[in-house]
Amino acid sequence: MGGDVAGAATYMHEVYTRSDASVNGRATIPVLWDKKTARIVNNESADILRIFNSGFGTLATGPDLYPEPLRAEIDSLNDAIYATFNNGVYRAGFATTQQAYDEAFADVFATLDALELRLSDGRAYLHGST
């Protein structure tokens, strides 16, 4: 196949199948695609951000998105956001009952409210100036 086969896909499951023909689960996004090996490197958003932050050596010249002094705080907030927001969106989307949908919906918007409150002090980022 060669080239950017991920970009030639119409549906996400095609990207997963091109990466690993034996895959049979749900095709989710985001994914980090390696054009050279034609493989999905990772499909977990927090991991992808860490890879972008430190996985490119001297090619990465931007700010440190995961500074050592803030890692515990970042990880804690990411875990909370993942449980109630990221997972809440999936729970709402795949809900099979109105009650399950309503609970997931409430989690998603409670998380957005909490994040908005955190940012209401004028900070630009969830962890202050970084």
Predicted regions and their residues:
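GST-like fold's C-terminal all-alpha helical module
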Residues: N24-G25, K35-K36, I40-T130
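N-terminal G-site of the GST-like fold
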Residues: M1-N43
